[in-house]
Amino acid sequence: MVNTDASWLCMKNEAYAPWHKPVLGYYVAGPGEFLSASKYPWGWEQSAYDDSKWLPAHTGIEGGVKGSRDYPGRLLVPCPIPPMDLLSERFEAVRISEGVKIPVGFLKTKTSLTVPANSKVHLLLDNGKLTTGYLSLLFSRGKNAEITIAYAEALYEGKELGTTKSYSFPAKGNRDEVEGKRFIGYEDKVIADGGEGRDFTTLWWRTWRYVDLTISTADEPLVLEDVYGTFSAYPFRCEIAFSAPGHDELNKMLEIGWRTARLCANETYMDCPYYEQLQYFGDTRIQAMITLYNTHDAYMVKNAIEQGRQSVVADGITMSRYPSSLHQLSLIHISEPTRLLSI
C-alpha cells in the first residue's frame, strides 16, 4: 500500500494542455495533447532533482479498504482485470519523406535524424497494421521547433471533402496505398525547448496504422533520436487451433479478426478504439462470445457484466453504453414495449 499522505510533494504541471484539432466524422474519444517542453519539469523522476519549490500535498479523506469497516468515503477495491500488455513496437517503413534524407536504420533501430534549422520536414510512417498504444518521440535541441504527430487508420482518396459526415467521406480504397491520398486524423503537438534527451510519450494511448509527422524548426536544428510505439491492449492470449488446408484466406481472416478483437479490448471492451472507445453492451455481447470461444480468460466478460449493472438508471433500465458521461438508452427499451402493446 502506498502511503500517499502530506509527506508527498506536488506541483501543477503547466506544460500540458488539450489539443483540440477538429476530427471529421463522429469522434467522441479524448483530445490530443499539447506539450510546451520549456514548461516541463524535466528530470523530476531523478533523485538529484531540486524539488524545493514543490508544495506539500494536502491530505483529503482517508481511503478505506473494502470490507474492513463502515466508511462514507472512497473504498479501495481490487482491480477486476489484469494490467494491460505493454510491448515495444517499431514502425515498418517511411512511406513518404519530404525535406530530409532518411538515414539507414531509421525506425528499425534507434537512429538519429537531423532536421536543419529554419526548415520543414514531413514524414509518413507506416506501422504495417493497425495498432493501439503509446507513441514515443525522442528528440534533442531544436528550440521553438513545432512537432505535429497525427494518427490515422488509413488514408482517403484525394478529392476534396464537401461534408463533415463520416459516411460521406471519400473511399479509403486499398489501405496499403498512400500515393495521391489524403491524411485525415487527430493529432498531438509539441513545442521543443532546445534541451537534450527529451522524451514525449502520449499520456493516453492512440490508435494508428499511419502516423503523419511534421517538424518545423526555427533557428536551431532538431535531432530526432527515435520514434516508436508501445502496444497496449488487454492481455488476451488466443488458445484455439484452426486448420483449413488449401484455404489460406481463412487463416488470414482469423488473424485479422483476432487482431480486431484485441484492439477493441483495453480496460473495457469498446466498439472502436479510434473514434469512440465506448463499451456498447450489444457489441459487448458479441465480443464476450469471441473471448470465451478463443480464450480461458473471463475477467473482461465479468467486468462488462458488472459495468452493465452499474449503468442501471432509476427506472431499472441499463444504459446502451457504459462507462459514459452521456446518458444514452438502447432503442430496445422503446421497441420491445411498443411491440408488446401492439399484440
Language-model region placement:
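Extracellular/oxidizing-compartment recognition motifs
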Residues: M1-Y274, D283, Y299-A304, G308, ...
